[in-house]
Structure formats: structure tokens, C-alpha cells
Regions:
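Glycine/charged-rich beta-loop-alpha catalytic/anionic-binding loops adjacent to active sites
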Residues: 84-92, 241-245
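A glycine-rich, Thr/Ser-enriched phosphate-binding loop motif common to dinucleotide/cofactor-binding enzymes
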Residues: 92-110
């Protein structure tokens, strides 16, 4: 029986990235829907799983994506609400790649290391940064997330990121530094620093992180020049620089692709798997 993946994307055009990776992971048929709202999910999901007997539903799954993480979470909730009795299919949420990226990076950082009690600072309060903060906290880290000030972003039209409110809801300590100096001061006593800023924005200077005596490990999520952390190469795979281990965006990305494909394959091993942030992290811990 063919493996069918129903792609529910909250954007107008379903992600070609997610579609191609699905095929590379072994999906036979991809049914892609764009501009999906939670209200539309029930008919789409039930229209899919009613075509097969309950014993055959492991050959069908749902992928939730798009650029809006909050909307994606609502769609995933609606997918699960559409289930009843034996009629359920596995589902995964990875809007904007937030879950696979964060899970992979933290799995790489945590591999073979005891993170309990370590101080971690996340620069940037977007979806990937906050997912990373949550996972680091689960590993026992003392976590601080900081926003990126206007002088670092290079803009005169700064607005308070909505991620601050999300951080508060998640119980993550977050600060909004007024300028670069205040942001860099927040890195004092940090053992781990993750740069999760916009593409092409350098958020951390080499002279700052190289001189930090407590800093042990840095990771950069930005693969576009200039990179997020000065002095780190995109391909750095936990190599040592200035006495600290550094992880570049391409090293994270390569492992992320393996995790992404493994997650898709696992969706078809049973019909009741839900891969949210925690579920994806469990897969990442097995893969990296």
C-alpha cells in the first residue's frame, strides 16, 4: 500500500522544501494544501483516513508546516481533534523548520555532555530560539533569552518582538537590551550561547565571545553571510576556536536533514505517533 503524506501548510503555497524532503524520505504520494486554517482541518484529515481500514492507517500521515509557528500549532491540535475511535493517523509539526532545527542543535550540544546547571543564553526570541531555550531547560540549563537591539539589527524602526510574550508564556526568562553593549553584558557567566537571529545579521562579535572566560560552547543558526557569530565558520562541527567549541549553521543543517527524514519515516511505522517539539527531540537524540 502506498505511503501517503497529507501536507497541511498555513502559507498560501505549500513548502517545496518540505515536499522534496518527504519524497526523499520515502513518501509515495504527497497531497499538498496551502492556506490551511484549523477550521478546515477536520474535513481534510477525515477525508483522508476514511479511505482506508483502521489496520491500514499506518500507511498515511499528516505533515503540518508553514511560516507561522503559532498557526501551525493550532492546525496540529485540530488534526488530533479530528480523530475518533480507531481512526487516527500519525502527525508531525515543523513550521518554519523550528522543531527539527532546534531539536537537532540541542541534541548535538547535549550529546555526551551533562548540561545540568549550565548557564545558556539565546540571542533572538524567534521560534527556533525559543524552542532551543525550552529544550535546554529540559536538559537542566539555566536559560536566558535576549532580544536583538536595533543597533545590532541595523535598523531605526525597532519593534518589541512578539517572542517576548511567548517566552513569558513558556516561563523562560527573557530580556530586551537597549543596545549592543547591554546585550553583550547579558552573556557574562554564560557557558553556552546560541545565536538565533535573522539571516545575514551578525549578532555576536569575535572579540566578545573569545574573551569570555566562562563560555564553553557556541552555536550559530545563521548560514547567510555575514554569519551570526563572527569568527565561526558555517561548517564548524563542534571544533575548537579560542578554547571554546563552536557549531556552525551548516553543521546543524546537515544533521537536521537526517533528523527530518527520520521523523517522516517514523510517521509510517504506526498510526498514533505525534511528533511535536518533544517528539522530534526524542528522534534527534537517537540520530545525532
Amino acid at each position: 500500500m502506498k505511503k501517503v503524506l497529507v501536507q497541511l501548510d498555513t502559507d498560501q503555497h505549500p513548502s517545496p522544501f518540505d515536499a522534496i524532503v518527504a519524497y526523499d524520505a520515502g513518501v509515495d504520494v504527497l497531497l499538498s494544501y496551502g492556506s490551511v486554517t484549523p477550521e478546515q482541518v477536520k474535513d481534510l484529515v477525515q477525508g483522508a483516513f476514511f479511505t482506508r481500514a483502521p489496520n491500514d492507517l499506518s500507511s498515511m500521515a499528516v505533515w503540518v508546516g508553514g511560516s507561522d509557528v503559532s498557526e501551525g500549532e493550532k492546525v496540529l491540535d485540530a488534526v488530533q481533534t479530528a480523530y475518533f475511535g480507531p481512526f487516527r493517523i500519525s502527525a508531525m509539526h515543523d513550521s518554519d523548520g523550528c522543531n527539527t532545527t532546534a531539536a537537532t542543535a540541542i541534541a548535538l550540544i547535549a550529546k555526551g555532555r551533562d548540561l545540568d546547571g549550565r548557564r545558556a543564553v539565546i540571542i533572538g526570541v524567534g521560534p527556533v530560539g525559543l524552542r532551543s531555550a525550552t529544550l535546554l531547560r529540559q536538559e537542566g540549563c539555566d536559560v536566558l533569552a535576549v532580544t536583538i537591539p536595533a543597533d545590532v539589527l541595523g535598523t531605526d524602526s525597532y519593534r518589541t518582538p512578539r517572542g517576548l510574550a511567548v517566552a513569558e508564556q513558556l516561563g523562560i526568562e527573557a530580556r530586551e537590551p537597549s543596545d549592543r553593549a547591554e546585550m553583550e553584558a547579558a552573556l557574562e557567566d554564560a557557558n553556552i550561547v546560541l545565536a538565533s537571529g535573522p539571516a545575514g545579521v551578525q549578532v555576536l562579535r569575535e572579540e566578545v565571545w573569545s574573551a569570555n572566560p566562562t563560555l564553553e560552547l557556541l552555536a550559530d543558526y545563521n548560514a547567510a553571510e555575514p554569519l551570526g557569530i563572527e569568527g565561526v565558520e558555517a561548517g564548524d562541527d563542534l571544533v575548537e576556536r579560542h578554547g571554546k567549541l563552536v557549531l556552525g549553521a551548516l553543521a546543524v543543517g546537515g544533521a537536521k536533514m537526517k533528523v527530518h527524514k527520520a521523523c517522516v519515516r517514523q510517521l509510517f511505522e504506526r498510526n498514533d505517533l505525534v511528533l511535536d517539539a518533544d517528539g522530534v527531540y526524542a528522534v534527534a537524540r537517537e540520530i545525532v
